[in-house]
Amino acid sequence: MSDTEKPIKSEEPVDEGVDRVDEEENVEEPAEDVGEAAEEASEAPEEAPAEAATTTEAAPADDDEDDSDLSDLDEDEIKNAAIEDDDDDYNKLSAHRRKVQSSGKKTLKKRATKDSRAADDDEDEIDHSHIDLDPSMARRREIEARIDAAMKPASQRRKKLGEDDIEMMQDERISNLREKMRNAAIADAESNREGQPATHKLQLLPEVKDVLQKHHLADSILDNNLLEAVRIWLEPLPDASLPSYSIQEELFDALVRLPIKSIHLRESGLGKVVTFYRKSKQPQLRIKRIADKLVADWTRPIMGRSDNYREKVVSTRSFDPSTQEIALAVAAKRAQTLKDGTLAEKQAERRRRAHIPSAQPANYRVAPKSEIIPQNRGGSTNDMTFKRLKGKLGVTKTGKKKSGVSIEGRGLNG
């Protein structure tokens, strides 16, 4: 070794002795305070490397003495004591503890309902009206808000209409239509008096047709007395002319479909107008037939008659030859008067008798009474003819049997 290293060896033992004394004092302290010993043991490795760099090379022989001094300390006691202290400190903490409920039941978080979510969405919306914006920006936001509102699906909060609300809407619609029909009829009457064309009812006819064709509005039509407006439309105009044929056709077809009763006829006065169309010569033949059918249907329950044709009672009259003889005598007397009359009377009678024939609906109300008495004849001859015809039909159905030999040779022995 060199001379420079010798003084270093002579000086280091003094430091080792001091360090050894310090370590012995530190070893005796864990009995009093184990926590401080554990902290010093953890901090020792950080300070040791600087000292170890000088002591490990200079005094390798002193390691045995250090181990002998440290062997007096029980390492198990230090570990157990440190663990117990750590458990005590850990138990004092409250953050890691789980709260135990007194009821012992798990409480589930309720799901937010649609209404609550919608309310939260409404609250989250910010009102930007108080913010000062440029006119162009404000207009743009307003347009975007309108587009969003239009693109939104149908509101789920919309209240469903009940039956009462629907009936009220239907009654209101029928009442408004009745007033329109009445005003149109008054306007047409005034136009007719002034010599102008009456077109107000024709303009309103499509709307009236649309309402009268709906079956679910039948009760509302009858309850709100729409038949009164129908009567006003069917009445003749001030110049005694009937309304347009299209109006007559649509209204009479609607009257056939409606379940009209006597109370409705009494309130509206419709029966008088229909009877007028039935008896008048102005309406078309189809309208007269519909009017005749309506009168028959309306008077049947009043007269107590059934609508079943099997139960219908037809009035009959028997033929009396004496009345026929009287009618022939009256006709002969009239012919004699024509011969004895003047020329003017003869011409007048001829003009009245000769005319162009016109088709008229024949409505027979009295049926002739049958006086035929059925007679039972002997059935022997009828039975014989029936058997004879039956035998002939059987022969024609079976037909004649084919003759000759088949290809296979059948019928050779026959």
From Swiss-Prot:
Bias-annotated ranges (Basic and acidic residues): 1-20, 127-138
PROSITE patterns in UniProt: TFIIS_N
Primary subcellular site in the record, as a coarse category: nucleus
Region (Disordered): 1-138, 395-414
Extent of Acidic residues compositional bias: 21-49, 60-89
Gene3D superfamilies: Conserved domain common to transcription factors TFIIS, elongin A, CRSP70 (1.20.930.10)
Domain of life (superkingdom): Eukaryota
GO biological process, one term: poly(A)+ mRNA export from nucleus
Biased composition (Low complexity): 50-59
Keywords: Nucleus, Transcription, Transcription regulation
Ranges annotated as biased composition (Basic residues): 94-112
Domain TFIIS N-terminal: 228-305
PANTHER family, per database record: PROTEIN IWS1 HOMOLOG
Described purpose of this protein according to its UniProt entry: Transcription factor involved in RNA polymerase II transcription regulation. May function in both SPT15/TBP post-recruitment and recruitment steps of transcription.
Name of the protein: Transcription factor IWS1
Annotated organism of origin: Yarrowia lipolytica (strain CLIB 122 / E 150)
